[in-house]
Amino acid sequence: MRMPPFNLHTPETLEQAITLSSELGDSGEEFDWIAGGTDLLPNYKWHLNVKPHVISLAKVSELSKLSETHIGAMVRLHELEDSDRVHPLISKVAAMVASVMIRRSGTVGGNICLDTRCFWFNQTEEWRESIDWCYKCDCGTGADCRVIPNQNTLCVATYQADLAPVLMCLGATIHLAGPSGALSLIHI
C-alpha cells in the first residue's frame, strides 16, 4: 500500500510547533501531529483520514523529559517499562503494550491520543464506500454509527489508549500547550 503525499514539518521547539499549527489552522489547512507514528502511519497507508500536513514532534527535545514527576509526550513506551523513575504500575502497563517494536517507536503522547478503533471506519476507502459512510468519518451529515444501527448522534468506537486508565488511577495531571496558551487537566 502506498503512502499518500503530505507535507512533513519538523519543528525543533514546542513554540515552533505551536506557531506552525496556528498558522496552518488560521489558513484553513488540516494537519495531524505525529509522535512515534505507530497509529498514524498505518492509517495513512490505508488512506484513513489523511491530512495534507503532518507536524512531527520528533525533534522537540523538551517533550522527551522523563523524571519522577514528569513524563514527556515524546517519551518512548519502552523507556517507561525499563525506568525506575516512574511508578511501578506505569512501568508494568507500558511493558504490556503491543509488541517490542511498537513500544520502541510508540510514545506516551501518541498512546494517550490514539484514534478510536472502529471496525467500520478502519477499512480502505473503497470498502467504506461499498457499505456507505459512518458517523465517525462523515460526522455532521446524518450518517449512522455502524456499531449501533439507526443512531446518528454519536460515534461509539472504543478508545484504546493503554496508559490513560493507569494515569487516571494515579491522579496524573496532563499539561497541554496550544496557540491560546497552556492548560492543565488535573487528575484526568
Language-model segments: residues:
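C-terminal structural segment of proteins
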Residues: 1-187
